[in-house]
Amino acid sequence: MNKLTKNMSLTAVLVALNVVLGTFISIPLGVIRAAPMQHLINVLGAVLTGPWVIVQALISSTIRILMGTGTVFSYPGSIIGAALAYVLYHYSKKLPLAAVGEVIGTGVIGALSIYPLMLILDLDTNIYMVMALAFLVSSIFGAGVSYFILLQLEKRGLLKRL
């Protein structure tokens, strides 16, 4: 199987996993739904598919919004987190940096980016800190679990085969 076909196939599988698991594991917090599965899948995708993880994040977020298990706030967190996880892993080839990239991208940069979105949507900005904290906690949890999964795959020699 050539690399393009492999990456497209893995991206489709990760989107499906994200949407299905996100249906069961979603934490409603006011106007957002914390999605630790999105963060888990983002880190896996950054390592397994490279830049395709950004496509996966966009498609997953769109489907989750259409299904009602995500909100418009899914975009800034998931896409920025996926992109930073990919960039840090791509240039370092270190699994911890993929997880750190997701946490910084979603939990910090993504959380900062929702404030202007809240202003545009005329939402109460008094709840911003709660939302930002939810982004951070959700991304730490999801990235942590994915890091553990990737370590186990690497330990068993399976990561190189994927």
Go through the PLM ranges and name each one.
Residues 1-162:
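Loop-helix junctions at membrane interfaces
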